[in-house]
Amino acid sequence: MMPLAAQDERHAGMVAYATDAMSRGEYELAERVAREVLAEGGRLPEAWELIAETALRVSRPDIALGAIEMAEALRASPAPATAALRARALTPPKPSPAGNDRYHIIRSWAQGFWSDVDHVMGQLLVAEITGRKPLVHWGANSRFRDATETGDANAWESFFEPVSSVKIAEITDRGLAYFPPKWNDANLTIGDNGAFHGPHSRIAALDFFAREEAVTVSDFHAPMLALTHWIPREHRLHSKPVSRVFMDLMQKYLKPKREFLTRADTFAGKHLSKPTIAVHVRGSDKAKELGDLSAAAALYHQAIASLSPLMGGKPKILLVTDWAPAEAEYRARYGDRVIVSGATKTSLSTGLHFQPSLIGRNLGEEVLMDALIAARCHAFVGLAYSNVSAFIGYLGRLTKGWDDSRAIQIGPSIHGVYNSFLLKRS
């Protein structure tokens, strides 16, 4: 554990960095770093003041006033800066834009399948917070389109039902204004349009608040954890934990195509009639991202051993993995108890979705089917810092009623971090 003095110094440096970001107009980065300081136990009033300043810039005086109260509680005496923030927060804001013709288009952010779904879930919450009709369109930048698909094909609807009745054709050719201004009627379904680099890149969520344009377009990820702080008090998900927010939004919007549900039920009827533990093992690019996973590998086997008595001693093991060496390891250890789907596997350090020789549509179907089947098992062991494991966990709780005793996630959660580094433009 870091010594207290070193931790305080680190937090002061983070607040200084966030203050500089705010001075450049990068208020979402500033707010995100301030949240990280507070999540680590930092007690700097300046962190709360940065949050208040951000809230005022996106027309959320309710959030600003709450942050100001926290800042004042940490100060020994009143500060002029805090008083100035309070005066601004108490100034009546201009009316919020209203009307039925307000849309939020959610593009792919061109990462892994469940990372893209994670992105969609967050932006669906943004649509609810901002009162916009959502439309998910995974266009030419999606890694999960069929190789033969061209033009305006929507890969999202290859896997899931539409999240609303709105179609791209209903939005275009009406003279509607767009934000960010890099978007227009003609380029909504194209490949990359500066999601990570260039003007109006790395726009995550807060820039969409209080916009007057009829159409907002998202092509960059915002962690659900960061978004939960901005849920209005009157919203059904206000103050709910991140896991509950995900599962609520999934129940409302995430509807896999009937063909996949039928296939998952058929597989379960054939292979999962006896007690089965689903085990999701990551390798390839996740090993590169997180480093040596050997310690986690040992914890997997401990978790399987702890779950086994609950299911008769020697349950079946459904191995869900993209990592070819894992199959050999599990078969050697557990023998014919192991069930493995036919999903594509690799021994390379490059994720399957980044390997150009593979067909994205097929990979998407495989990883979706793996998750749906795993969620039909009796228990689960996964890597918490993986969207695949995270969504299997949510699906299993919704499908099979798993609780923490039956769904073991190893390590810190991928949905428990703010990932402020994603917003850094330099």
Sequence positions of predicted segments:
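Short coil turns that delineate tetratricopeptide repeat
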Residues: 42, 76-77
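A donor-sugar binding/catalytic signature common to diverse glycosyltransferases
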Residues: 121, 365-414
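Secretory-pathway glycan-assembly enzymes, especially type II membrane glycosyltransferases
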Residues: 95-306, 310, 314
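"A position-specific structural signal for the A-helix of alpha-solenoid helical repeats
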Residues: 16, 50, 83-87
